[in-house]
Amino acid sequence: MLNLILMILLNLVVGGCIGLTGIAGFLLPMFYAGFLDMPSSASLALSFAAFLISGILGSVNYYKSGNLDLKTASVLSAGSFVGALAGVKINLLIPADTMKIILYLVVLLSGISILLRKDKPGNTEKKAVQSVPFFLVLGAVTGAVCAASGAGGPVLVMPILTLLGIPAHTAVGISLFDSIFIAVPSAAGYLIAAAGNKEVFLLLPVLLVAHGIGVFVGSKNATKINQTLLKRIVAVASIAIACIKLFL
């Protein structure tokens, strides 16, 4: 019962953080596997199912607030869907520790780049939608890495989009939309792999409701945060997360 309460609370908090900044989803598989000793397939199945909910609810709220560039998001997501399909397969071939090291190195560099980068007048989404092939490749690579490592997507995608010149709130909206197309093939693949684990399917509806509530509340309040402050929060959080995972 204690484990269930902790899982519900974690999904509420992580959902809220995802709604606000786009990041924190990686905490779910880390908690499930690291603290509860869940099998890898079960922890990833529960995590990516939650990421699907956060992606849908978060995207809707960010779209309503005018912070979702569908053109960029659609191109990126097309690449991510294909990449995620490959990522689930890669997870079975490459040691998970290796994939996590790759992920957090990229997160670390992205966070540092955001802190060092200075905003320029007129820096808008126009810079980011110029190259369709670039965003297809970016989506494929990030989708594969995230699906294989257990990260939902925004923790890697959001800092990169911000680095490319996309406003912070819009970058969160795009990364949440993109996470839907990482989560669909990933959740399906890992749920199939965990088909023999009845506990997963009993926990799923309760945890998804808790996660959804957190995301809804967080994304509703995201625009109340100053954009410059949001960038710094994401950058510092990304650096801290990466350093903890890489060096501790």
Predicted features and spans:
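Generic hydrophobic alpha-helical segments
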Residues: 59-60, 187
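Extracytoplasmic gate region of multi-pass secondary transporters
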Residues: 154-155
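Transmembrane helix-bundle signature of multi-pass membrane transporters/permeases
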Residues: 44-52, 172-180, 238
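Juxtamembrane transmembrane-helix boundary motif
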Residues: 1-40, 60-148, 158-164, 168-170, ...
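Accessory recognition modules or surfaces
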Residues: 130, 180-184
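Feature detects amphipathic, helix-rich regulatory segments
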Residues: 173-175, 185-189
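Central hydrophobic cores of alpha-helical transmembrane segments in multi-pass inner-membrane proteins
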Residues: 54-56
